[in-house]
Structures are given as structure tokens and as C-alpha cells.
């Protein structure tokens, strides 16, 4: 408990001098009837001191307080005694220990916020700092390394299957290539426009940019520019043999891959959203799209027709994923919603998980023990990890850890061998790994 430097002793004095239930008159206010706070802490250097350098005598039985009121209770309420239900764990209640918050061996309760001075390398409090000196909270995962190079927000991360190269895209208009063995940047490609998203599909690396999609075949070095989008391309996904792009003008463009010519050819344009399409996901022979217009649209991959529009979110729909037979969506309205099909095939909300902040991105993974975990990035610069023991009748989000960042985490990517990646608004990419044994967080 924090001790009130200005009013704490006064409250103790008032209780000792007469409070609720007292039949004797209140003693006159006099500094000589107050115990010196600095003397109690063992460091008073005033001579003479206007306050007492001894403890006040306690009231006799039945005097000064109501029934059942004891000196022990007075001491506990003033913040100077042993254990009480209001004290944090690890409080040393030994009478010989230092009192108040100055000294003693009391355990420091950590605030769930990274110390800014530690980030800058000049925190002098060490283990006694009330803020965290690490980038995560949790024992089942650990930070492996950090990849520095981007100067602005990381908007996409891709790890092609079977490749030893990691690709990251950023609003600094560059695509960086990283060697997975050494963690070193082996190439930087300046694209001349902000990168909105990055996708790996087979041998193809696809990058969303203003007014186009860039496509590279990393096996043959062939490249292609797919024109047609109006404004920034925010999201890319592949369904059956079609590539879909969500664009700033609210349309979804589709290209079909022609194996004979090794090229993507325009196929269709899906319209219906009134604002930018910021997220796409394919599952159960459906294309799901989330938009700044606060809606989710469900499209049939058979005929590319919209078969349902979901309107339960009250702000921008930021991310969509499918998990088993469920659709999960998140929004800047501070919620994660779980949708399930009802009779007739339409989706409805079966559970809403509320956060204190807007939710930016979702990613479903399995930990080292193959347990399902939901990664949930929020706009308070954190990534929350939730156990998902069931998405059936009894849905529950159980938090198992947090990852902290200097700015918002906007990109998440899963890798092989229990590895996953996060990219934040400063341009930092961090590499994490699930642990088979509990491991303390690394700085």
C-alpha cells in the first residue's frame, strides 16, 4: 500500500484521539501529539523536532474506539503493520523491518508496462524498478532475436515454405530479405511506394502497393506487376486458383494464375464494400472480407457472389481468421467476435470477447504442446496470447502471456519449429519461439 506522506499520520492521530463510537472529547490538534514520520523511518535530523520521537500509547480497553477495535487494526490501516488483505504478496511484516515504502525487503509489484528508461538503456532502479525490463510476460515462449533495418511500420511478413529466407515489407517503401540462419539482412529492394501487405504462396512472393500488386517467382526470378487496384492494396489472399486483393476503394480484385504462361490474368472484381477492404481470409469454400465500413462480407468461391453481410461490429474490422468451423473477427470497437453457422448456413455471433483497446490483428497458432493459442494484437502496443481450450458451447479466453512493443504490432507470421514473428510500428521485427519447458522472459 502506498503511504500518504501528507495525511497518513493525521488519520492515525484522529483515530487514536477519538473516532466513531468514542465517548470522550477529541484531543486538541497539536504537533506534539503526532509521531514523527521521519523518526519512524530512522532518518529524522531535526533538532528540536516538533513531532514525537516515540509511539503514542494505545487506548485502554473500551476507550476511544468501538467494540472489537484494536491497536493492531489501527496499525494495519495506517500502513505500518504486518500482512493484511490489502497488501501485495511478499510484504515483510517483521516489526524490525523498515516501515512505509522507504526501505525494507518488500517485493516490488511490476506494472504491466515496459520501462522507457530501460528501453533507452539508462534505468538506475534495476530489479527494484516498478516497470518491466523485458519485452514479454509469460513462461511458455521466449524472444530469440530482433531484426533491425526498417524505418517505419512493418506491414507484412512472409516466410515461403521450404525457403531459408524471410521477407518483410514496410511503409518505408522497402522489402527486406533476411537469412534465417544468421538473422542478417541480405537484400533491400526499394519499391517506390508504401507496402500494404506481403503474402507468400508456393514459389510466389506477392506485395500489395498503391495501385498495383507486385509478384515475384523466387525460384525463377520472374516478376510481374498486376494493375487494376485503385489506391493502396491492404490485403492479399489465395483461394482455389484465384488471387484476391482488398483495395482502398472498397473493391476486391481477383486474378487467375495461368500455369501455361506462368502469369496472373485478371478474372473478376467483387464490389459491395463502401470503404477500404483491410482484411481477407479464405476458408470453407468461402472468401471473407473485412472493411473500414464496419462490415464483414461472405462470398461464395463457386460464383464469387456475396451471400451474407455481417454488421455486428461498430468500428473498422481489422482482421479475420477461421478456426475449425468458426470465424473469428476483430475490430477497433475493442472486441473479438466468434461466429458460427446456424441452420441454413448463415453466420451469427456466438461469443464476444471484450478488450480494453482496439484490436488490430489475429493469428491462430499451436504452442510446443500442440495446444491452440490465439495471438491478439491491440493498439496499446501489446500482443496478448490466449489459450483457447474450446470454441464449442463453453468459450473462454484464458490469457497466458503478453508481448510488448514500442509501437503497435501490425504484422504477425507463423514459422516452422514453434517460431513466430511480430512486426511493429517502429520497424522492428522480433523472432519468438515456443518453449517445451517454462522459460523466463529474455530482455
UniProtKB/Swiss-Prot annotation:
A GO molecular-function annotation: mRNA binding
One Pfam family from the record: WD40
Chain positions covered by the region annotation Disordered: 1-29, 56-99
PROSITE patterns: WD_REPEATS_1, WD_REPEATS_2, WD_REPEATS_REGION, ZF_C3H1
WD repeats: 149-190, 228-265, 272-311, 313-349, 354-396, 404-442
SMART domains listed in its UniProt record: WD40, ZnF_C3H1
UniProtKB keywords: DNA-binding, Metal-binding, Repeat, WD repeat, Zinc, Zinc-finger
Zn finger (C3H1-type) location: 30-56, 109-136
Protein name: Zinc finger CCCH domain-containing protein 63
Amino acid at each position: 500500500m502506498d503511504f500518504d506522506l501528507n495525511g497518513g499520520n493525521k488519520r492515525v492521530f484522529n483515530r487514536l484521539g477519538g473516532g466513531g463510537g468514542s465517548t470522550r472529547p477529541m484531543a486538541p490538534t497539536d504537533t506534539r501529539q503526532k509521531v514523527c514520520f521521519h523518526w519512524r523511518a530512522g532518518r529524522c535530523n531535526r533538532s528540536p523536532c516538533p513531532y514525537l520521537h516515540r509511539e503514542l500509547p494505545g487506548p485502554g480497553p473500551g476507550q476511544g474506539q468501538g467494540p472489537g477495535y484494536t491497536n493492531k487494526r489501527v496499525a494495519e490501516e495506517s500502513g505500518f503493520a504486518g500482512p493484511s488483505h490489502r497488501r501485495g504478496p511478499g510484504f515483510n511484516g517483521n516489526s524490525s523491518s523498515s516501515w512505509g515504502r522507504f526501505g525494507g525487503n518488500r517485493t516490488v509489484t511490476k506494472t504491466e508496462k515496459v520501462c522507457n528508461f530501460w528501453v533507452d538503456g539508462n534505468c538506475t532502479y534495476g530489479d527494484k524498478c516498478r516497470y518491466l525490463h523485458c519485452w514479454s510476460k509469460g513462461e511458455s515462449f521466449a524472444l530469440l532475436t530482433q531484426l533491425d533495418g526498417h524505418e517505419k511500420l512493418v506491414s507484412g511478413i512472409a516466410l515461403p515454405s521450404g525457403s531459408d529466407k524471410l521477407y518483410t515489407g514496410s511503409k518505408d517503401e522497402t522489402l527486406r530479405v533476411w537469412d534465417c540462419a544468421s538473422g542478417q539482412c541480405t537484400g533491400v529492394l526499394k519499391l517506390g511506394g508504401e507496402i500494404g501487405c506481403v503474402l507468400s504462396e508456393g514459389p510466389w512472393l506477392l506485395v500489395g502497393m498503391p495501385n498495383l500488386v507486385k509478384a515475384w517467382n523466387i525460384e525463377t526470378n520472374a516478376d510481374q506487376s498486376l494493375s487494376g487496384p485503385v489506391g493502396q492494396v491492404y490485403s492479399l489472399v489465395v483461394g482455389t486458383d484465384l488471387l484476391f486483393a482488398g483495395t482502398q476503394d472498397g473493391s476486391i480484385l481477383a486474378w487467375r494464375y495461368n500455369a501455361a504462361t506462368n502469369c496472373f490474368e485478371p478474372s473478376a472484381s467483387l464490389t459491395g464494400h463502401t470503404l477500404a477492404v483491410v482484411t481477407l481470409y479464405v476458408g470453407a469454400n468461402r472468401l471473407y472480407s473485412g472493411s473500414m465500413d464496419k462490415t464483414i462480407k461472405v462470398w461464395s468461391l463457386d460464383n464469387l457472389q456475396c451471400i451474407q453481410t455481417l454488421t455486428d461490429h461498430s468500428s473498422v474490422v481489422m482482421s479475420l481468421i477461421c478456426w475449425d468451423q468458426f470465424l473469428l473477427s476483430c475490430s477497433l470497437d475493442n472486441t473479438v467476435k466468434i461466429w458460427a453457422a446456424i441452420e441454413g448456413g448463415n453466420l451469427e455471433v456466438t461469443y464476444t470477447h471484450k478488450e480494453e483497446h482496439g484490436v488490430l490483428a489475429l493469428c491462430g497458432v499451436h504452442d510446443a504442446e500442440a495446444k491452440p493459442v490465439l495471438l491478439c494484437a491491440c493498439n496499446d502496443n501489446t500482443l496478448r496470447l490466449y489459450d483457447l481450450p474450446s470454441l464449442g458451447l463453453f468459450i473462454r479466453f484464458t490469457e497466458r502471456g503478453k508481448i510488448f512493443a514500442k509501437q503497435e504490432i501490425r504484422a504477425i507470421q507463423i514459422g516452422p519449429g514453434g517460431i513466430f514473428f511480430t512486426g511493429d510500428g517502429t520497424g522492428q521485427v522480433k523472432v519468438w519461439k515456443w518453449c517445451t519447458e517454462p522459460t523466463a522472459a529474455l530482455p
